């Protein structure tokens, strides 16, 4: 089946197409997806620009109703959307359905935000003068989304953009575009006017670059790699006029396990954070920093649990770990496994798994005897690969945890209130978890990090308004 870009409510074909392959079964082609060029991208931007004046002038009630209908439709189709997501990206079916549910919840939340826009009215320091502070839409917003959450991340960017009256050009990841395509179709069914949301399928180096350079695009929100994010930021500041930019770029997240931790709880937090979703989460626990008193018991228990995980076809109900997303990521993961061994760490697991279908199946890999200077502890792998770093005590654990170029998520397992509070205060990450996996954030709270992980305003929750709206201060002489 062929899938085209969607511009101004119409399907727009491209001369080139890319195959979307099921990573659980390489013989299963999900579809042939358009590979748009710069001209098609510019067409989408012009459609969004033309739709902006009328959409930004709509009432909060109208925007609420459309977003709420979209939420209802998504939640009614969780089974279908979850299965489509798992088929193209490789998440287990339970994870795929959970992500589709999250997308519906996000739209419901931002439907409510349409009615909570608010503002301020203040007296001036000058007599007889009033001050009104309001928020306004930016204009055309370019959204560039990754493959690892192919419906949730488009949802948490699209929903606030529309709630605040912006129009959108969405460019989903080329290797997992089907979920975004289905989401755009649902929004049209919910009554979103033509041109307000436009979907451009294609390569980031073509579509993304056109979005960054076009003068009618007011802002870019990007989730992806650090290197690409930096190029986008440079392009947005070099463009005329300059663009507002928001970047989410990954992590190398620590989970600290102290001697006083509940061992079973700590192991389950590490197992979930490091290996679920095949480790393909920017919030994954890729560095397990463990004090020496509990180290051996923790490693033994975690090794036992991880090697018992069922690796297989994403749509098989028995599967706990699905395939790696594609050949390129599969080779990256195997390369880091070889590199960790070469660096002197001891490998547990990490074998290629043969299944009934040909796919990118990899057993979770755990490195012990690692140190924080190794590449496997410094660089984001984005696969089911984690390392254990032994430390003496809480102070040395904090030093290692914060010794990273990233700062997205962090966690600690402890029964000590003293250490839990100290960790939350001293963690160099934007999110800190106590006795929980580092992966897993509610949809109504801010998401984002520090250092090389994030740049610009936070995503999600009420904090999303800071990116998707502009503040205006108006004075009136009475």
Language model: regions and residue ranges:
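Short, well-ordered beta-strand elements within core beta-sheets of diverse protein domains
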Residues: 30-36, 51-57, 143, 255-258, ...
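Hydrophobic face of amphipathic alpha-helices that form TPR/SEL1-like repeat modules
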Residues: 1-25
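ALDH superfamily catalytic-core signature
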Residues: 219, 227-371, 434
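Conserved C-terminal structural/oligomerization subdomain of aldehyde/semialdehyde dehydrogenase
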Residues: 28-31, 217, 310, 337, ...
């Amino acid at each position: 089946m062929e899938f085209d870009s969607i511009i101004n409510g119409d399907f727009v074909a491209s001369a080139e197409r890319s195959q979307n392959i099921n990573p659980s079964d390489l013989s299963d082609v999900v579809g042939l997806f358009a590979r748009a060029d710069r001209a098609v991208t510019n067409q989408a931007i012009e459609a969004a620009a033309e739709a902006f004046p009328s959409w930004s002038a709509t009432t909060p009630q109208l925007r609420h109703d459309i977003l709420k209908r979209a939420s209802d439709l998504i939640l009614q189709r969780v089974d279908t959307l979850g299965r489509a997501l798992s088929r193209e990206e490789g998440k287990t079916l339970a994870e795929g359905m959970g992500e589709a549910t999250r997308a519906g919840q996000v739209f419901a939340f931002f439907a409510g935000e349409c009615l909570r826009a608010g503002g301020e009215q203040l007296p001036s320091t000058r007599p007889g003068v009033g001050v009104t502070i309001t928020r306004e839409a930016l204009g055309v917003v370019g959204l560039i989304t990754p493959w690892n959450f192919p419906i949730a991340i488009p949802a948490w960017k699209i929903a606030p953009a529309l709630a605040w009256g912006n129009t959108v050009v969405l460019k989903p990841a080329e290797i997992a575009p089907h979920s975004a395509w289905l989401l755009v179709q649902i929004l049209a069914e919910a009554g979103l006017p033509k041109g307000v949301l436009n979907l451009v399928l294609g390569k980031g180096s073509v579509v993304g670059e056109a979005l960054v350079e076009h003068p009618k695009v007011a802002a870019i929100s990007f989730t992806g790699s650090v290197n690409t994010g930096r190029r986008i930021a440079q392009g947005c500041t070099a463009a005329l006029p300059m663009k507002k930019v928001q970047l989410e770029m990954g992590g190398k997240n620590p989970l600290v396990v102290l001697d006083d931790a509940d061992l079973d709880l700590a192991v389950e937090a590490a197992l979930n954070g490091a290996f679920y979703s095949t480790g393909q989460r920017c919030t994954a626990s890729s560095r397990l920093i463990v004090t020496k008193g509990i180290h051996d018991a923790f490693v033994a228990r975690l090794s036992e649990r991880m090697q018992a995980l069922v690796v297989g076809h994403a749509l098989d109900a028995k599967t706990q770990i699905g395939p790696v997303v594609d050949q390129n990521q599969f080779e990256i993961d195997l390369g880091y496994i070889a590199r960790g061994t070469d660096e002197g760490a001891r490998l547990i697991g990490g074998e290629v798994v043969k299944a009934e279908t040909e796919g990118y199946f990899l057993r979770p890999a755990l490195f012990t005897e690692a140190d924080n200077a190794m590449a496997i502890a410094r660089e984001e792998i984005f696969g089911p690969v984690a390392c254990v770093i032994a430390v003496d005590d809480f102070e040395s654990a904090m030093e290692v945890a914060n010794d990273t170029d990233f700062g997205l998520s962090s966690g600690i397992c402890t029964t000590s209130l003293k250490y839990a509070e100290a960790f939350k205060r001293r963690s160099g990450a934007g999110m800190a978890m106590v006795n929980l996996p580092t992966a897993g954030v509610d949809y109504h709270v801010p998401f984002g990090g520090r250092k090389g992980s994030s740049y610009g305003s936070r995503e999600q929750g009420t904090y999303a308004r800071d990116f998707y709206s502009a503040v205006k201060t108006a004075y009136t002489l009475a």
